[in-house]
């Protein structure tokens, strides 16, 4: 697990400003990624790292896109599922702020914007019907479209910073997606994904 240096700065500022909201948001974001991590371990994904960023956490996998569809769907949905359970729990014990944080993390991660869970689920869905490379191209276009829409309707500077980071990640993905596609083909897992969905 790696922690981005700016994360410590944000935590210090949150402590100095008595912002428990930010600390809770970061903790539940980490819990979200732990959900991904545990399922990734169970299905023997090749885990590269978990990075704790100032505005959340991110699990990096070396072999994402090279497993059976049910394994990847299970891994991708486990993070949002953790937040859904937390949302229901905090509603039940009447902690609306913590419930709000978890439903926000859940909805945000299901947006079809790379590298969020929703974008990867979209890629899995599209790749079952069309060529994988074409699916990746659509994934990138949808990501850029949603970033533009969210940038226009978002007023808060903190959210715009997050959108800027997502835009940067999409551009990196755009530069490398052909290489990722070739690696996926060479791994000989693409045909398994199309055939062995329920096994």
What is each PLM-predicted segment?
Residues 1-199:
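Hydrophobic transmembrane alpha-helices and their immediate loop junctions
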């Amino acid at each position: 697990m790696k922690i981005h240096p700016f994360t410590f700065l944000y935590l210090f500022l949150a402590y100095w400003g008595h912002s428990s909201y930010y600390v809770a948001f970061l903790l539940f974001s980490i819990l979200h990624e732990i959900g991904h991590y545990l399922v990734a371990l169970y299905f023997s994904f090749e885990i590269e790292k978990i990075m704790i960023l100032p505005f959340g956490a991110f699990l990096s996998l070396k072999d994402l896109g090279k497993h059976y569809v049910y394994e990847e769907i299970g891994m991708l949905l486990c993070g949002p599922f953790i937040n859904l359970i937390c949302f229901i729990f905090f509603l039940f014990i009447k902690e609306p702020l913590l419930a709000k944080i978890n439903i926000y993390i859940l909805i945000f991660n299901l947006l079809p914007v790379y590298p969020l869970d929703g974008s990867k689920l979209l890629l899995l869905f599209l790749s079952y019907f069309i060529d994988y490379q074409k699916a990746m191209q659509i994934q990138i276009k949808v990501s850029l479209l949603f970033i533009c829409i969210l940038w226009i309707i978002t007023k808060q500077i903190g959210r715009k910073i997050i959108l800027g980071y997502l835009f940067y990640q999409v551009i990196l993905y755009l530069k490398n997606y052909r290489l990722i596609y070739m690696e996926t083909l060479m791994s000989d897992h693409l045909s398994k994904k199309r055939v062995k969905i329920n096994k």
